[in-house]
Regions:
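A short helix->loop->beta-strand "cap" motif at the edges of active sites that frequently abuts
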Residues: 18, 83-86, 103, 211-215
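Cap/insert and terminal regions of metallo-dependent hydrolase folds
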Residues: 166-215
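Short beta->alpha connector loops
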Residues: 7-9, 68-71, 93, 165-168
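Active-site HxH/HxHxD metal-binding segment of metal-dependent hydrolases
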Residues: 31, 49-113, 126-130
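Conserved beta-strand hairpin/beta-sheet module of binuclear metal-dependent hydrolase folds
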Residues: 1-52, 142-163, 182
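Metallo-beta-lactamase
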Residues: 6, 89-157
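Pre-active-site segment of Zn-dependent metallo-hydrolases
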Residues: 18-64, 75-80, 129-134, 167-177
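Active-site neighborhood of phospho(di)ester-bond hydrolases with catalytic His/Asp-centered motifs
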Residues: 22-23, 59-68, 88-91, 159-165, ...
């Protein structure tokens, strides 16, 4: 297994003979509007990509989009990723978003799927700690839904990408059911006046205690 965190939630993972690109946000630094948060008017992305987009895409077999918010699937990704690339998404809303950009092989992960020698399992996510955030997310981004993804293959550790979530029953269930050995958690506790969007420090500790053997 080779895992390269590129920026934010964007990760390139070579695993079980397949190379995955997870949540590609490929825009140049500062070219996207600020996201709704207590950080105010910081433009996104906050940092440059560490390597060229061409190098990021080199060798990629499949793209996984945990949800279609712009920091996980942006116009730059839609333009750069080949249109025949398989794209794994969470639901019909996100499938429609990706298909609208011309992609021809968009697959909804509803439970379990097989990619080569790798088994993908959907894990539920909850992108808010207060139901009051749902209308805001839907108004600004089109959706409040998100998912996590668990990857398994022979001879490699089980890997769990939490996606954008807070601690809730679904996350705890994924830890219990899949017993991941590697956990890639989207953290930072990002908040709006209506509530929190991501795992905070205390919840990361909670994950660590729930899965003490995991990295």
């Amino acid at each position: 297994m080779e895992l390269l965190q590129l920026r934010n939630a964007t990760v390139k993972l070579s695993y079980g003979g397949t190379t995955f690109l997870i949540d590609p946000m490929l825009s140049k630094k500062g070219t996207l509007d600020p996201f709704p948060s207590l950080r105010g008017d910081e433009r996104n992305p906050l940092n440059d990509l560490p390597i060229p987009v061409e190098e990021i895409l080199n060798g990629v077999d499949v793209v996984i989009v945990t949800h279609s918010h712009i920091d996980h699937w942006d116009d730059a990704a839609a333009q750069a990723v080949p249109k025949d690339m398989p794209i794994i998404v969470q639901d019909q809303f996100d499938a429609d978003v990706v298909t609208a950009s011309g992609f021809k092989d968009v697959r909804i992960l509803d439970g379990e799927a097989r990619i080569g020698q790798v088994t993908l399992n959907r894990a539920e996510g909850q992108h808010y700690d207060s139901p009051g955030l749902v209308p805001l997310l839907e108004e600004v981004t089109g959706t409040a839904a998100t998912m996590g993804v668990v990857l398994r293959t022979d001879g490699e550790p089980t890997v769990y990408f939490t996606g954008d979530t807070v601690w809730f029953e679904g996350l705890e269930t994924a830890l219990r059911n899949f017993a991941p050995q590697v956990i890639v958690a989207n953290t930072g506790g990002n908040s709006t006046p209506l509530g929190r969007l991501l795992l905070d420090d205390a919840e990361v500790v909670r994950i660590s205690r729930a899965a003490p053997e995991a990295t």
